[in-house]
Amino acid sequence: MVQGTASSVGKSLLTAALCRIFNEDGYRVVPFKSQNMALNSFVTEEGLEMGRAQVFQAEAARIKPQVKMNPILLKPTADSHAQVIIQGAVHGNMTAQEYHQFKPQLKSMLRDIYLDLETSNDIVVIEGAGSPAEINLRDQDIVNMGMAEIADSPVILVGDIDRGGVFASLYGTIMLLEESERSRVKGILINKFRGDLKILEPGLKMLEELINIPVIGVIPYERFDIEDEDSLSDRLQQKNHQESDISIAIIRLPHISNFTDFHLLEQMEGVNVNYIGRNQSIGRPDMIIIPGSKNTIGDLKYLQEVGLAAEIIEVHKTGTMICGICGGYQMLGNRILDPNHVESPEGEIQGLGLLDVETNFESEKVTTQVSGKILDHKLLEEIECGGIEVKGYEIHMGRTLRGATIKPFVKIEERLSKPVDDFDGAINEAGTVFGTYLHGIFDEISLVEKIINGLLMKKGLPTIQQRNCSLEELKDREYSRLAKVVRENIDMKYIYKILEGEA
């Protein structure tokens, strides 16, 4: 089990690295995280919802994501409130206190799921959450030492040296553990190291003497193009000042969800992706994207209050391309109705009015994988997108109805692997504004290249050459690069001793 001294120390990436290493060594390996708190989620082939961290870890292990890899998903909806998703389905909304009291009821389920994974695989790599030293949560813990006890798992503790204070955080974490918990920790990993290892080594020896646990690796600081939750969160706080031919502004909503949708856009050469939030001007980008939201009405009110809604409408008048995904699509419409107060105490809110659609919130959540083709449309009246095959997944509570004159954007041909005859999204007559419920639509490189090249042509600039590999191939290369870096800087012989119970 991989635990850390705090959030964002690199647990998710190291779990993925171990999954790829064990896979390369010929083992059947599966990732597992009992409880994930995130707004980035994924829908499986069965239409079940799970955290994206276990999705990229499954990809690293070269297996399909399954909801039992992440049986509990918490999606914050407001301060101290979250939607609780158990085994891929919505259980209900709870306050932090309500969920804390509810957790003991989940232990038997976690035990059964873990045993199922253990019996059908050679190795289960478990990821913890935050820190195991949250002593106020120890009695009801099901994600750190509580999960280690359920699985009877040895633990590797990870510290982030890049933030400073790594020795204090590692020592303090170990000292705050109970003796039975401390005995589970078989090794220490130092992550995100920059500098001369020889200067660090005396400190490692002193730490080992203090805690009587070996340091089994020092992982160098390295950036990877992987949809890891922590690195994505960091990117939301950054503003890219690099010069580029194409500028894309993504609105940083307070409850932004599934910002993994923009991974490929961020990888495109000559494209500058900026996340625009409070006290920032949108400027004059080539494209604006309003992403998904876990609190669509609340985030739309936020856009109106901080002036971003008015700015989006003004930029629209210049002919700039605007796209909305899921909650962003709903915001582009005329209004959003919530008569049953599924999401908000308010029953209605006016939208941006850029698409002739109207959304009605319903209590039943839609979670489904879909595939289809973009209809015969021209974005900006020039970019031919008709016939491009797209696939993705829907996660939403609302139903959106198009006005009499507006056209759908995508022809849905398959839903949950079954043929259907349906439509998704909407696009205006000029091709300047479109919306869709499909998360993952911008993972389709043909569509992304069409849009980028169309924007380049509009500015009289040379177009980019088409890539010869898919996003899946690009990610697979990164998983292998990640595994190589970790394998070269960790004592894998000792890791296998831990697995054999010899450490």
Curated annotation (Swiss-Prot):
Q: Which residues form the active site?
A: C326, H439
What are the residue boundaries of the GATase cobBQ-type domain, all occurrences included?
245-447
Q: Which UniProt keywords apply?
A: Cobalamin biosynthesis, Glutamine amidotransferase
* Gene Ontology MF annotations: ABC-type vitamin B12 transporter activity; catalytic activity
- Which GO biological process entries does UniProt record here? cobalamin biosynthetic process
Which Gene3D superfamilies does the UniProt record give?
A: 3.40.50.880, P-loop containing nucleotide triphosphate hydrolases (3.40.50.300)
Instruction: Give the domain of life.
Output: Bacteria
Instruction: Give the matching SUPFAM superfamilies.
Output: Class I glutamine amidotransferase-like, P-loop containing nucleoside triphosphate hydrolases
Q: Which PROSITE patterns match?
A: GATASE_COBBQ
- What Pfam families does the entry give? CbiA, GATase_3
Xref: InterPro entries = Class_I_gatase-like (IPR029062), CobQ/CobB/MinD/ParA_Nub-bd_dom (IPR002586), CobQ_GATase1 (IPR033949), CobQ_N (IPR047045), CobQ_synth (IPR004459), GATase_3 (IPR011698), P-loop_NTPase (IPR027417)
So, what pathway does this thing act in?
Cofactor biosynthesis; adenosylcobalamin biosynthesis
Q: What does this protein do?
A: Catalyzes amidations at positions B, D, E, and G on adenosylcobyrinic A,C-diamide. NH(2) groups are provided by glutamine, and one molecule of ATP is hydrogenolyzed for each amidation.
Please state which protein family the record places this protein in. Answer: Belongs to the CobB/CobQ family. CobQ subfamily.
| PANTHER family per UniProt | COBYRIC ACID SYNTHASE (PTHR21343:SF1), DETHIOBIOTIN SYNTHETASE (PTHR21343)
Instruction: Identify this protein by name.
Output: Cobyric acid synthase
